[in-house]
Swiss-Prot record:
It catalyses: a sn-glycero-3-phosphodiester + H2O = an alcohol + sn-glycerol 3-phosphate + H(+). This is Probable glycerophosphodiester phosphodiesterase 1. Its cofactor is Ca(2+). CDD domains: GDPD_like_2. Residues 12-264 form the GP-PDE domain. Keywords: Calcium, Glycerol metabolism, Hydrolase, Metal-binding. The active site is at residues 17, 59. Transmembrane segments: none annotated. It is an enzyme of class 3 (hydrolase). Induction: A possible member of the dormancy regulon. Induced in response to reduced oxygen tension (hypoxia). It is hoped that this regulon will give insight into the latent, or dormant phase of infection. Was identified as a high-confidence drug target. It comes from Mycobacterium tuberculosis (strain ATCC 25618 / H37Rv).
Length: 274
C-alpha cells in the first residue's frame, strides 16, 4: 500500500518515535521490541557516528541525558559506548533487567530486528547535523543499507527504509546517491517546508512538527500537489491524532505507538474520524 493509498483510506501509518519511548527508554532494543509488538507500522531512530566509524542510535550529541556516561558520542569508540547503561534514567528500568535490553543499540542491530520481524515494518533513520563527521554520516548509512539490501528498492513505496534530516544538504546527498530511497526533509516552521527547499533537494516527503502543522494545516494539500507526503512528529494526544488524520497526514510519529494504533483502528472500524 502506498502512502497515498493509506491517506485515502483515512488511516495514517504509525511510526514509533525512538521506539515505544514513553513506556521504555528511547533508542533501546526494549523500546523498539515493544513498539513492534504493539503493532507499529514503522520505527524511527536518530543516528550518530562513533569515533571509530560505527552508527549508533543516540539522539543527543552528549551522553549525559540518556546514559550513565558523559561527553560527546562522536569522541568515543563503540567499545567505550558499550560500557554504559542506557536505561537507568527511565521509570521503567529495573535492576534485574526485566524491563528489557537497554544496552547501547547500533543501527545494525535495529535494522536486523526490523527486517527479521514477522511483518513488513519501515525504519525511518534521521541523520543529525551539524556534526563532527559531516557527510560521512550519510556515506556510512548508505553503506549499511546496501549491506542489508535495502538501499535500492524497486520503488519508493516498497522501500523498507526512509532517510530523514533537518539538513537539506543531507537529504540531497541521499537523493543523489540513492534516488529510489524515500527521504523526508524535517522542519519546525511551515514557512521553511513550503519554500523551495524540499523541491530543490528532491525530498519525497516533508516532516513538520505538530505545532508547525497546526499553524498551517494547508501544508498537507500543498505538499500533495507537489507529489510529497507528510510525516508529522511528536503526535501523542488523541485530539492531535484525529487532527493529523483529518488533514491527511501519511505518517504519525508518536511516543505511544500502541495506543495511537488502537485509536486509529477503532475510528476506522466505526467509520468515524471522531
Amino acid at each position: 500500500m502506498t502512502w497515498a493509498d493509506e491517506v485515502l483510506a483515512g488511516h495514517p501509518f504509525v511510526v514509533a518515535h525512538r521506539g515505544a519511548s514513553a513506556a521504555r527508554p528511547e533508542h533501546t532494543l526494549a523500546a523498539y521490541d515493544l513498539a513492534l509488538k504493539e503493532g507499529a507500522d514503522g520505527v524511527e531512530c536518530d543516528v550518530r557516528l562513533t569515533r571509530d566509524g560505527h552508527l549508533v542510535c543516540v539522539h543527543d550529541r552528549r551522553l549525559d541525558r540518556t546514559s550513565t556516561g558523559a561527553g560527546l558520542v562522536s569522541t568515543m569508540t563503540l567499545a567505550q559506548l558499550r560500557e554504559l547503561e542506557y536505561g537507568a534514567w527511565h521509570d521503567s528500568w529495573r535492576p534485574d533487567g526485566s524491563h528489557g535490553d537497554t544496552s547501547l543499540l547500533t543501527l545494525d542491530a535495529l535494522v536486523s530486528l526490523v527486517l527479521d520481524w514477522h511483518r513488513p515494518v519501515k525504519i525511518f533513520v534521521e541523520t543529525k547535523h551539524p556534526v563532527r563527521y559531516g557527510s560521512l554520516v550519510e556515506n556510512k548509512l548508505l553503506a549499511l543499507l546496501h549491506r542489508f539490501g535495502i538501499a535500492a528498492p524497486a520503488s519508493a513505496d516498497r522501500s523498507r527504509a526512509v532517510v530523514m534530516s533537518f539538513s537539506a544538504a543531507a537529504v540531497w546527498r541521499i537523493r543523489r546517491a540513492a534516488p529510489l530511497l524515500p527521504t523526508v526533509l524535517l522542519g519546525k516552521t511551515p514557512r521553511y517546508l513550503t519554500s523551495s527547499a524540499a523541491t530543490a533537494v528532491g525530498a519525497t516527503a516533508v516532516g513538520p512538527s505538530l505545532p508547525a502543522l497546526k499553524e498551517y494545516p494547508q501544508l498537507v494539500d500543498r505538499s500533495a500537489a507537489q507529489g510529497r507526503a507528510v510525516y508529522c512528529w511528536n503526535v501523542d494526544e488523541y485530539e492531535d491524532i484525529d487532527f493529523c488524520r483529518e488533514v491527511g497526514v501519511a505518517w504519525i510519529g508518536t511516543h505511544h505507538p500502541g495506543r495511537t494504533k488502537a485509536w486509529l483502528e477503532d475510528g476506522r472500524a466505526n467509520g468515524t474520524t471522531r
